[in-house]
């Protein structure tokens, strides 16, 4: 018997303090496509995984990464991101 969520699509929730600034960063700097938007969240497609950027009123930064990408050349990727920022 398959697991309940075995074939379900994952959507990750990322808290942000400024929804429009986050949208600009994920769309313009990271190059992700916006798939949905409302007053409370913006959803971007990260190569098939949906990231829901959700505005929260009391954002407490954490000392760990909440999302990461595996890339073939980290130095080239950093250079490309810096050039877009």
Q: What name fits each language-model region?
A:
Residues 2-4, 56, 83-85:
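Proteins with a high burden of low-complexity, intrinsically disordered sequence enriched in S/T/G/P/A and R
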Residues 1-21, 50, 64-67:
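N-terminal beta-strand motif that seeds the catalytic metal site of vicinal oxygen chelate
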Residues 20-33:
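Amphipathic alpha-helical segments
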Residues 32-72:
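Conserved short beta-strand elements that form part of the metal-binding/catalytic scaffold
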Residues 1, 26-28, 77:
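Terminal low-complexity, poorly structured segments
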Residues 19-20, 67-85:
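Vicinal oxygen chelate
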């Amino acid at each position: 018997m398959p697991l309940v969520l075995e074939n379900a699509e994952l959507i990750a929730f990322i808290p942000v303090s400024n929804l429009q600034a986050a949208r600009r960063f994920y769309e313009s700097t990271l190059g992700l496509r916006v798939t949905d938007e409302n007053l409370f969240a913006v959803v971007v497609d990260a190569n098939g995984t949906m990231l829901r950027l959700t505005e929260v009123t009391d954002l407490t930064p954490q000392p760990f990464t909440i999302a990461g990408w595996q890339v073939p050349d980290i130095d080239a990727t950093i250079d490309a991101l810096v050039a877009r920022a």
